Regions:
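AMP-forming adenylation/ATP pyrophosphatase catalytic core
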Residues: 14, 29-34, 74, 78-79, ...
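Catalytic subdomain that performs nucleotidyl-dependent activation
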Residues: 3, 7-96, 129-130
C-alpha cells in the first residue's frame, strides 16, 4: 500500500539510492523465473485498507514486529509520522515517487537501446565495446553494467552501487584489467570488456 511505498522510498533515500532505488516498488515486475508480481494497492492508504478489511471480515490482524524498534522500517515509519505531524504532505511524496518512476522508465528505454548498440551476448558471455561505452553519461554506464551483470550472473539483485561505480572507474582509468564482481569475471581486452559467469 501507499504507506509501505513511502517507507521504502525513505529507507532507500537514507541509503543514498539513485533513480533505480528511489523509484521504489513497481506495480508490476517480472521475476527471473518468468512469474509476474503485481502490486495493485500501491495507491491505497493503509488506514483505508484496514477500514475495508474490518467492514468485510470484521477484524484485522496486527504484526507485533511492526513495533520492534530494532528494525529500520519501524523507525522509518515513526519518522514518516513525524513528517506528517510537521505538515509534510505525504501525498506529494507519493507523487514524487511516481515522477522518479517515470524518469526510470525513460532511462530504461535509453539503456535498452544502448545495449543493443554496443553489447553482444553470446555463449553465456557479454562483450562490451568499451570505447562507445565510455561516451555514455555516468548513469547510463552504471545501468548498462548492472544489466550485463544481472544477465550473465542470473542474479535478481545487482551488487551495491558503489562497487559498480568503482568497477567502471577502475577500467576507465586502466587501474585494473581483470576482476570479479556480482558473480561475474570482467576482463579488458584492447577496446572490449569481456564478461563471463564466475561459477
Amino acid at each position: 500500500h501507499q504507506d509501505d511505498q513511502i517507507e521504502t522510498f525513505l529507507i532507500r533515500l537514507s541509503r543514498g539510492s539513485g533513480v533505480e532505488g528511489l523509484s521504489s516498488m513497481q506495480e508490476m515486475i517480472t521475476l527471473k523465473n518468468g512469474t509476474r508480481l503485481i502490486r495493485p494497492l500501491l495507491d491505497f492508504k493503509k488506514i483505508d485498507l484496514i477500514k475495508i478489511a474490518e467492514n468485510i471480515f470484521g477484524k484485522t490482524l496486527k504484526d507485533p514486529s511492526n513495533k520492534n524498534k530494532k528494525f529500520l522500517r519501524t523507525n522509518i515509519r515513526a519518522l514518516k509520522q513525524n513528517l506528517e505531524n510537521k505538515g509534510i504532505n505525504i501525498e506529494k511524496i507519493s507523487r514524487s515517487i511516481k515522477n522518479i518512476a517515470s524518469t526510470k522508465e525513460a532511462i530504461d528505454f535509453y539503456v535498452a537501446k544502448s545495449i543493443k548498440k554496443f553489447v553482444v551476448f553470446e555463449n553465456k558471455k557479454a562483450i562490451l565495446n568499451f570505447v562507445k561505452f565510455q561516451n555514455e553519461p555516468l548513469e547510463i554506464r552504471f545501468r548498462i553494467m548492472n544489466s550485463v551483470i544481472k544477465n550473465i550472473s542470473k542474479s535478481y539483485y545487482p551488487p551495491r552501487s558503489i562497487k559498480v561505480f568503482n568497477l567502471i572507474e577502475g577500467f576507465q582509468r586502466i587501474r585494473i584489467k581483470k576482476c570479479t564482481l556480482g558473480g561475474c569475471i570482467f576482463e579488458k581486452k584492447k577496446n572490449f570488456l569481456h564478461v563471463t559467469k564466475e561459477y
